[in-house]
Amino acid sequence: MLSPKRTRFRKQHRGRMKGIAFRGNRICFGRYALQALEPAWITSRQIEAGRRAMTRNARRGGKIWVRIFPDKPVTLRPTETRMGSGKGSPEYWVAVVKPGRILYEMGGVAENIARKAISIAASKMPIRTQFIISG
C-alpha cells in the first residue's frame, strides 16, 4: 500500500475539490492512460487494486506508471464514541483527484491489451474514467 514515509503534520483538513486538474492531466510516460472524469478521494487500497489488476492483465509485457500518490491522511473516530475530545486518529491515506487527472499510464503493449487492462483497473475506481491515447 502506498503512503508517505513521513509528513510534516499528522492530520489535515478535508478541503474542497473545486475545478479541474491543471497538473498531471497529460500523458507523460506511456502511450495509453486512464483519466478521471469526476472529483474524488481515491484510497491507497483502490490505487493498489487497480495497479495489480493492470499488471495481472498485461502479463510480462508492458510497463505501468501510477500517476497519483495518496498523501492526504483521513482520520476516523472509534465507533460508539461520544462527540468532542478532539479529532480522530489517521486511519488511511487518499489521493485527491480532480477531473482530468491521469491515474495510470501504460506503454509497450498493443492497444487492445492496454484497453482491456485499463478497463479492469477502471472498474476498481470509485469514479467515472476514460481511456485515452497519446498523440
Curated annotation (Swiss-Prot):
<dbReference type="Pfam" id="PF00252">
    <property type="entry name" value="Ribosomal_L16"/>
</dbReference>
<dbReference type="GO" id="GO:1990904">
    <property type="term" value="C:ribonucleoprotein complex"/>
</dbReference>
<protein>
    <recommendedName>
        <fullName>Large ribosomal subunit protein uL16c</fullName>
    </recommendedName>
</protein>
<dbReference type="GO" id="GO:0005840">
    <property type="term" value="C:ribosome"/>
</dbReference>
<keyword id="KW-0934">Plastid</keyword>
<comment type="similarity">
    <text>Belongs to the universal ribosomal protein uL16 family.</text>
</comment>
<keyword id="KW-0689">Ribosomal protein</keyword>
<keyword id="KW-0687">Ribonucleoprotein</keyword>
<dbReference type="GO" id="GO:0009507">
    <property type="term" value="C:chloroplast"/>
</dbReference>
<dbReference type="InterPro" id="IPR016180">
    <property type="entry name" value="Ribosomal_uL16_dom"/>
</dbReference>
<dbReference type="InterPro" id="IPR047873">
    <property type="entry name" value="Ribosomal_uL16"/>
</dbReference>
<dbReference type="InterPro" id="IPR036920">
    <property type="entry name" value="Ribosomal_uL16_sf"/>
</dbReference>
<comment type="subunit">
    <text>Part of the 50S ribosomal subunit.</text>
</comment>
<dbReference type="GO" id="GO:0019843">
    <property type="term" value="F:rRNA binding"/>
</dbReference>
<dbReference type="GO" id="GO:0006412">
    <property type="term" value="P:translation"/>
</dbReference>
<dbReference type="InterPro" id="IPR020798">
    <property type="entry name" value="Ribosomal_uL16_CS"/>
</dbReference>
<dbReference type="InterPro" id="IPR000114">
    <property type="entry name" value="Ribosomal_uL16_bact-type"/>
</dbReference>
<keyword id="KW-0150">Chloroplast</keyword>
<dbReference type="GO" id="GO:0003735">
    <property type="term" value="F:structural constituent of ribosome"/>
</dbReference>
